[in-house]
Design a protein with these regions (language model features):
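Boundary at the C-terminal end of the N-terminal hydrophobic targeting segment
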Residues: 17-21
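Thiol/disulfide oxidoreductase modules built on the thioredoxin-like
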Residues: 102-104, 111-156
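A short beta-strand-turn-helix
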Residues: 22-43, 66
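Hydrophobic beta-strand anchors of alpha/beta hydrolase catalytic cores
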Residues: 44-45, 75, 131
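Bacterial N-terminal signal peptides
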Residues: 6-15
């Protein structure tokens, strides 16, 4: 019996790590850039919330983009769920559970900072969802306000990667 315990523990740890959402709490918009993979030539930011219907509808498309391009694209979600008053810990758990249910494994920020500061940093008026694509230097290349058009986003990313 004892020989099976380490194996079972290993299986549980692998299953948890493979399916677990990467949710990071952040208050300062200036630190968003630190959340990107330094190696990725394309960086994508998607601002969303669990209560936003078009945000939820586009999650599968974002997961597809993340899976399609792998390490060539650093995709970062920014959840605005904390902007609604309530129990912050419960809301953060809700976001984490939502990401797990949707099988989202790319990094997501649980944003707890000032919404105006975030809007200024990303140059948007607070209307979500919004998806912004940057090159490695941080120069904005493309943005889409509203529900993501997956084919347009993929075409833009392919163009940035040299047609790969």
């Amino acid at each position: 019996m004892r020989a099976y315990v380490p194996f079972a523990a290993f299986c549980l740890s692998v299953a948890t790590a493979a399916g677990a959402a990467n949710l990071v709490e952040l208050r300062e918009p200036a630190k968003i850039a630190d959340s990107f993979s330094a190696r990725a030539p394309v960086r994508v930011v998607n601002v969303w919330a669990t209560w936003c219907v078009p945000c939820v509808e586009e999650m599968n498309d974002l997961r597809t983009i993340s899976n399609t391009f792998g390490t060539q694209v650093s995709l970062l979600g920014i959840s605005l769920d904390d902007m609604i008053p309530g129990d912050r810990n419960a809301t953060k758990r809700k976001v984490s559970d939502f990401l797990d249910k949707k099988r989202i494994t790319y990094t997501n920020i649980y944003y707890r900072g000032n919404s105006d500061a975030l809007g200024d940093k990303l140059r948007f008026n607070g209307e979500i969802p919004i998806t912004i694509v940057y090159d490695r230097t941080g120069r904005e290349v493309w943005r889409q306000q509203g529900k993501l058009d997956r084919e347009k986003a993929i075409a833009q990313i392919r163009k940035m990667l040299g047609g790969k």
